[in-house]
Amino acid sequence: MLKKLTRMHRAYWLLLVAVAALFTQSAYVFSGKDDESSSIKRWKKGAGWGWIWGEEDEVGSLNAMTPESVSSAMKIATRGNVYDLGITYSRRSFKWPGHSPGEIMSYRSPEGEKRQLDHDFIAPDVNKIATGWHSCALFINDNVATQIDGLGHITAGDDHHWYNGFREGDWGGDFGLRKCDATTIPPIVARGVMLDVAGLKGVDQLDAHYAITPEDVEAVLKRQKTKLMPGDVVLFRTGTLRHWGDDGSNVDVLKKYDTAGITLETAKLLVEQYGAMLIGSDTSGLEVAPAPEGSPTFIPVHNYLLVEQGVHIGEFHYLEDLARDKVYEFCYMATVNKIAGTTAGFTLRPIAIR
């Protein structure tokens, strides 16, 4: 990370400070309730979060953010160093096999416009300096590249219910989700903690299918001299994204290492004992694959976090620069695409500020 920020970085930093100040002054609480009812007190040690925010809630544990928690997170950013946690997506990028391929196609181009002349405003006698434009049409899955899973992403049971009891028979649709879609994920500003498990093990990346245990979490915290607090965004580094390169087209290598991840026991530790508000990693699925023998589902961590606890999952977060600089605590900021019906925020560019 550059020690001296460019003018653009400084301007961006000042903008973020201004936004955070506005956030605090507005006393905006995501649950729509007062500070007391939406405070971290709603989390219960030993139980975690769960369906505690009311029968119409679509936000989950992110309700715990308050102006006070945002202000506290902003105070971590004392150096002004901005870390880009997003990865570049292209039509060749690696993705989980359960998601559709994508295409990025030129829709309009200066040469095409000149030949087609299908708009009056580009006729030569009107468009005398030959102004042209580029635009693209995208066919893309809503779970690719850097992501934050929405609470409607995963369903459970014969009734196909998701977080807070919303059911497919009531709230599914031909044009995406009608409850808990990605538009319900609020802007996230929180204390972030990176747990460098690859660093703990002294390897570039964890072995394929490595299961990150509660013991690993405690060992990393001790090694990094880091503490977890209720309301944290917790991100695990496996080292997988060191192989992403320019656009994630090194599919065979990524597919191999993308299988390392956390166990259900680790997820429960973070939620029920530490109060994690969002849990993520540098892989496509956060949890170890395949699921441990005896698991009732192929993705037990997703089921527990999204459906049972209402805790969003961050995926494909680029953590290599944070690991290089040994930055384990930071202010985490992320916003998602406000596309109605989508099941996740995708191709995101969250940032960590220290």
What is each of the regions a protein language model found here?
Residues V29-R354:
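Active-/binding-site microenvironments in catalytic and ligand-binding cores
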Residues W13-Q25:
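Bacterial N-terminal signal peptides
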Residues M1-M8:
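N-terminal secretory signal peptides that target proteins for export/translocation
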